[in-house]
């Protein structure tokens, strides 16, 4: 019986450790407030539909919230697996973010059906 409890504990630890393995650190370059496809003024006058906030665990925009299930950084690129909550229901997908020299970030989904440029808002 003790062996079963030990095994359950090990499986639980492995699952919780694996689930957080792809989390983004608090100082990661991808995090912050952005606008999509238009330069950000950051003075409150940016269109609501263009605003995007990326935190350590999710992307929040007017169309919905996408939670990071996994994130793998590779230099100036981050490949993510997300679950998005939309009014029509949940959707899972893969998104790649690429940091550009001009301080913008390219955003593209796996199937290349949606691309965008994210402009960082001044703090």
Predicted regions and their residues:
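Beta-sheet ligand-binding and adhesion/scaffold domains
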Residues: 81-123
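Positively charged n-region of N-terminal signal peptides that target proteins for export
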Residues: 1-4
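N-terminal glycine/threonine-rich, aromatic-flanked beta-hairpin/loop signature
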Residues: 42-83
